[in-house]
């Protein structure tokens, strides 16, 4: 624990100057109530009981000066988030009053909480398992409703259940094997068919859970999409139609966009950062050259590139030059201005590669956006993301540990097939148990905990 035995305090809400009607200062620890009683004056006959809200004033105990009119929420152990005594001051919003209240708490004996320390205490006291604790951070940082739902499912324990069952199965098998090692003459032989079946069933379940990792990563970090192409093919019009706003300036003059314009969208539950880039061409204009260079960098940094061309002019040498630079990226060809060509137009004639994913749009008329989103989802999900039928998903840390468990179980299968001594079976089973315990928090090092909770905000 970062501040073992001490009462911690922090501002639990975002501080935005001149915005927000309420700001919360949170205390947790054995001295939380005593500190609150030194700072808070509750008029009348209000009773300091658990899970009650008191009305009153936060005062400086040295001067008696009132700092803020506030509500106080009291939650005594173990019926609190951390399973310690927890007190919250619900102050007026803004920056000044809430910071003064926090400072008074620190002067009264509390120490400033480190990032994630409240949730760390909840984990250490058994209020949350490690998957639930990580889901708290995911819920706070969710960038889409689907990401929030996945985090909430993890917080409700839906991820821990299959993991605990897997670990129990491995422990049961290990116990059976060790019993045969220690008491071989007193017990019947191992049922190899049953053990092999249990190992195979466990591997099937591990693979099912691992299949959610890509979906989880997309939900948490989102997708970066770069719109590239030569000048005046309709890149900015595409961004505006897609974002349903005038994010980018649109004119008939080549080189209007000089810098990367960003917009944030949600496509099929996946947060998407869209980068509208400057038209790529040879130019002597120094400012435009900088914009072109940034376009190249945006394309290289993107998870997916939308190469936009003009249906009126078809495939040009400039398009080919750009395609050569981005063809190794995940790529979709967008044939824009389809409304300006006749019905005899053949989009396949514009393809530099027959296998290239393409679609047609009329961005100025807001046409083709649904097709664009469908193509993006198909591209990043391979048609349908594995594990998409589950309402939760694992993160990269959990996937790495689960992959180790999978390899260990596969080693057990190989050991059984090769009829190696039972001692060899136990080595890989213990590693599988250890790897699964790292996910649930039953076997986890202090350095892993530090890494996990360092990404939390202060006050959570």
UniProtKB/Swiss-Prot annotation:
Record GO cellular component, one term: cytosol
Main location: cytoplasm
Cofactor: how bound: Binds 1 potassium ion per subunit.
Leading EC class: hydrolase
Residues where (6S)-5-formyl-5,6,7,8-tetrahydrofolate binds: 26, 88, 127, 460
Source organism: Cyanothece sp. (strain PCC 7425 / ATCC 29141)
HAMAP family (UniProt xref): GTPase_MnmE (MF_00379)
Name of this chain's protein: tRNA modification GTPase MnmE
Function: Exhibits a very high intrinsic GTPase hydrolysis rate. Involved in the addition of a carboxymethylaminomethyl (cmnm) group at the wobble position (U34) of certain tRNAs, forming tRNA-cmnm(5)s(2)U34.
């Amino acid at each position: 624990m970062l501040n073992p035995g001490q009462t911690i305090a922090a501002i639990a809400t975002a501080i935005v100057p001149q915005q927000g009607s309420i700001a919360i200062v949170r205390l947790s620890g054995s001295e939380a109530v005593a500190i609150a009683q030194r700072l808070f004056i509750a008029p009348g006959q209000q009773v300091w009981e658990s899970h009650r809200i008191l009305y009153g004033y936060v005062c400086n105990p040295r001067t008696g000066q009132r700092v803020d009119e506030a509500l106080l929420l009291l939650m005594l152990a173990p019926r609190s988030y951390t399973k310690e005594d927890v007190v919250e001051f619900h102050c007026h919003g803004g920056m000044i009053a809430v910071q003064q209240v926090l400072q008074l708490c620190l002067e009264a004996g509390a120490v400033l909480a480190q990032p994630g320390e409240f949730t760390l205490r909840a984990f250490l006291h058994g209020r949350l398992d490690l998957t639930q604790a990580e889901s708290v951070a995911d819920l706070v940082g969710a960038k889409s409703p689907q990401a929030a739902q996945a985090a909430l499912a993890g917080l409700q324990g839906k991820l821990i259940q299959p993991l605990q069952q897997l670990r129990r199965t491995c422990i049961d098998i290990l116990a059976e094997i060790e019993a045969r090692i220690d008491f071989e003459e007193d017990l019947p032989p191992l049922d190899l068919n049953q053990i092999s079946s249990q190992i195979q069933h466990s591997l099937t379940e591990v693979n099912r859970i691992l299949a959610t990792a890509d979906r989880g990563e997309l939900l948490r970090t989102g997708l970066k999409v770069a719109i590239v192409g030569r000048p005046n093919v309709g890149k900015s019009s595409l961004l505006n139609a897609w974002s349903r706003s005038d994010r980018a300036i649109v004119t008939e003059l080549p080189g209007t966009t000089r810098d990367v314009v960003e917009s944030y969208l949600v496509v099929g539950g996946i947060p998407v950062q869209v980068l509208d880039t400057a038209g790529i061409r040879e130019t002597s204009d120094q400012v435009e050259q900088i914009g072109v260079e940034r376009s190249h960098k945006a394309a290289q940094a993107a998870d997916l590139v939308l190469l936009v061309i003009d249906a009126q002019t078809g495939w040009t040498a400039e398009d080919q030059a750009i395609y050569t630079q981005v063809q190794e990226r995940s790529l979709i060809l967008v044939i824009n201005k389809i409304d300006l060509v006749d019905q005899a137009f053949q989009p396949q004639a514009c393809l530099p590669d027959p296998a290239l994913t393409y679609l047609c749009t009329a961005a100025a008329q807001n046409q083709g956006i649904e097709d664009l989103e469908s193509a993006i989802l198909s591209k990043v999900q391979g048609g349908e993301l594995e594990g998409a039928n589950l309402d939760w998903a694992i993160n990269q840390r959990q996937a790495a540990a689960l992959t180790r468990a999978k390899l260990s179980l596969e080693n057990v299968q190989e050991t059984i097939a090769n009829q190696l001594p039972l001692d060899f079976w136990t080595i890989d089973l213990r590693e599988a148990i250890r790897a699964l315990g790292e996910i649930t928090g039953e076997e986890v090092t202090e350095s892993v905990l530090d890494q996990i909770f360092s990404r939390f905000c202060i006050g959570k």
